[in-house]
A protein has these predicted regions:
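Transmembrane beta-barrel domains of bacterial outer-membrane proteins
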Residues: 1-17, 27-62, 98, 182-190
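Residues on the lipid-exposed face of transmembrane beta-strands in outer-membrane beta-barrel proteins
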Residues: 3, 42-46, 97-101, 115-117, ...
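Transmembrane beta-barrel strands of outer-membrane/channel proteins
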Residues: 3-7, 56-60, 113-119, 157, ...
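Extracellular/periplasm-exposed beta-strand and loop segments of Gram-negative cell-envelope proteins
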Residues: 11-38, 60-93, 120-148, 176-181, ...
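Repeated loop/turn-to-beta-strand initiation elements of outer-membrane beta-barrel proteins
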Residues: 51-54, 109, 163-167, 198-202
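Ordered, amphipathic secondary-structure segments that act as subunit-interaction surfaces
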Residues: 92-98, 105, 110
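A contiguous binding-surface segment within folded domains or other stable secondary-structure elements
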Residues: 150-171
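Transmembrane beta-strand segments that form the barrel wall of outer-membrane beta-barrel proteins
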Residues: 166-179, 183
């Protein structure tokens, strides 16, 4: 089990279509949502039987800000004008469960494949003075949200340099249409782990999560392009 801090560098673009398809809104630049964040992250793995295991992961990220627009932004059939002050925010929660089987193990290495499920909750909002056909509709807050279970396949490889040092890598992938969602998902990690004591170790890894999805729901017709990446510093406990 690992617990620690995920130092994310995030890039967020969303699209909310109106009567005609819209353009992506860059929340890092146009809405000035910060690209850097730190959040708690937890990972666990339990081996049952000689070759089977189940793993899990959880982390979330949220941020909001206020900014003066430098260009017009379109949201459904509404427009927020350049020069106006707006508030904006995004949040993402990721929970992952993965069942795997080891196919090749040795004294110093292990390789396995499996399948899992990501549960994602994503939301975004913009608030300010909205216009439609150049006429003000007044101050309002518009928000979209989506949550979905997305299945995936993946694999991992571990290599122990010595009794105390180990390299671990894993990757999950999804490219499929599921209900109202279609697109791709990548969730990858590469880590160096040091076993400082018998049951306690330290880890430094690089985490990469990317979701590019089109959404066709009654309350959100559009899409999202999300990338969260950065180091994960952890305390590892094993028994």
């Amino acid at each position: 089990m690992s617990m620690g801090t995920f130092l994310t560098d995030k890039k967020v673009k969303i699209r909310v279509n109106g009567s005609v398809p819209g353009e992506d809104i860059d929340f890092n630049e146009g809405a000035a949502v910060t690209s850097n964040d730190s959040t708690f992250s937890g990972v666990f793995r339990w081996r049952f039987g000689e070759k089977w295991s189940v793993a899990g992961q959880y982390w979330d990220s949220s941020d909001s800000s206020f900014v003066t627009l430098t260009e017009d932004i379109g949201w459904e059939d509404y427009t927020l004008k350049a020069g106006s002050n707006i508030g904006a925010g995004v949040e993402l929660t990721v929970a992952r469960v993965f069942f795997g089987r080891s196919f090749h193990t040795g004294a110093r290495h292990e390789f396995g494949l499996g399948a899992g499920l990501h549960w994602l909750e994503f939301g975004a909002f913009i608030e300010g003075e909205f216009f439609i056909n150049d006429e003000s509709t007044g101050f309002r807050r518009e928000a979209v949200s989506a949550d979905a279970p997305l299945p995936n396949i993946g694999g991992w490889y571990w290599y122990a340099f010595s009794p105390r040092w180990m390299l671990t890598t894993r990757v999950d992938w999804l490219g499929i249409t599921v209900g109202d969602y279609s697109g791709s998902l990548w969730n990858a990690n590469a880590a160096i782990n040091f076993q400082a004591w018998r049951h306690v170790g330290l880890g430094l890894s690089y985490q990469y999560f990317a979701l590019d999805v089109d959404i066709e729901k009654s309350d959100w017709n559009g899409g999202a392009d999300l990338t969260y990446r950065g180091p994960f510093i952890s305390l590892n406990v094993n028994w």
